[in-house]
Amino acid sequence: MVLIIDRLYEEVNKKGNVCVGLDTDLSYIPQRFLKNYENIEDAIFQFNRKIIDATHDAVACYKVQIAYYESFGLKGLMAYKRTLEYIKKVGCIAISDVKRGDISKTAEMYAKAHFEGDFETDFITVNPYMGMDSIEPYMPYLQNKEKGLFALVRTSNPGSKDFEYIQSGSGRRVYEIVGEKLERLGEKVMGQCGYSSIGGVVGCTTLEDGKEIRKNFGKTFFLIPGFGAQGGGAKEANVYLKDGNGGVVNSSRGILLAYKKYENGEKNFDECSRKEVLKMQKELGRE
């Protein structure tokens, strides 16, 4: 059976490692475009649609951060739903950045909420720091359907060192132990590509840690945030990749707000986003 991770691996082979983050704040939408819409739902969705139309042939996937949509209530969630549906319509892969983290029946309900029904998506992000019993309820969807997870391992925020870097009695850091347990569980959902449908979220803001993480977790496909606005660059991101694959590199504001770099960029903001994607591809070594 071909798993969702095999699809993502092939998308990277065909289109490169760029993941567009649709973390769409209302303030990101150009005023000349925003004034065409009477309600928030349409404004956000139509902005996203323009970005998707301009980039879907050049990106591996899209990451949709649900908080930006939840903040606008039901209209925002409708824009979220329509965005996921449109990503599917154009034949692309969606990662819903929801960072769920709970156990037992609650985790089962989270799985149902995001892998079925109105908010159905391909991958979701999860927080495993409550323990592996916060991951196991998702396994039936990974084993029986084309769904996947990206679990937080070593994040890109400065505060990650508050907990993730704490050393155990054996001298190993907490994030290393988490990554090891995730990779072990991931052996139950290995794709034909050699990677598991349980991926890891690893920030591209520290070069040396990145080299060790890639070396230690050879079967884990990475979602790599921190590029651009958070200070990470191609050098830091590339250490997580293996033969040009094995990860997708996310940029959100850098792509959504690319139009601000250009004179009269608001008029063709979607084309500016495409230029930024192609620039990012080149930086990551994809010509």
Swiss-Prot record:
Q: Which UniProt keywords apply?
A: Decarboxylase, Lyase, Pyrimidine biosynthesis
Catalyses which reaction(s): orotidine 5'-phosphate + H(+) = UMP + CO2
Return the broad EC class: lyase
The protein's matches in Gene3D superfamilies, at most eight in alphabetical order, are given as:
Aldolase class I (3.20.20.70)
Tell me which Gene Ontology terms the entry assigns under biological process: 'de novo' pyrimidine nucleobase biosynthetic process; 'de novo' UMP biosynthetic process
Q: In which pathway does it act?
A: Pyrimidine metabolism; UMP biosynthesis via de novo pathway; UMP from orotate: step 2/2
Q: Which Pfam families match?
A: OMPdecase
Gene Ontology terms for molecular function: orotidine-5'-phosphate decarboxylase activity
The record's similarity note reads: Belongs to the OMP decarboxylase family. Type 2 subfamily.
PANTHER family per UniProt: OROTIDINE 5'-PHOSPHATE DECARBOXYLASE (PTHR43375:SF1)
What's the protein here called?
Answer: Orotidine 5'-phosphate decarboxylase
Q: Which organism is it from?
A: Clostridium novyi (strain NT)
In the UniProt record, the gene name given for this protein reads: pyrF
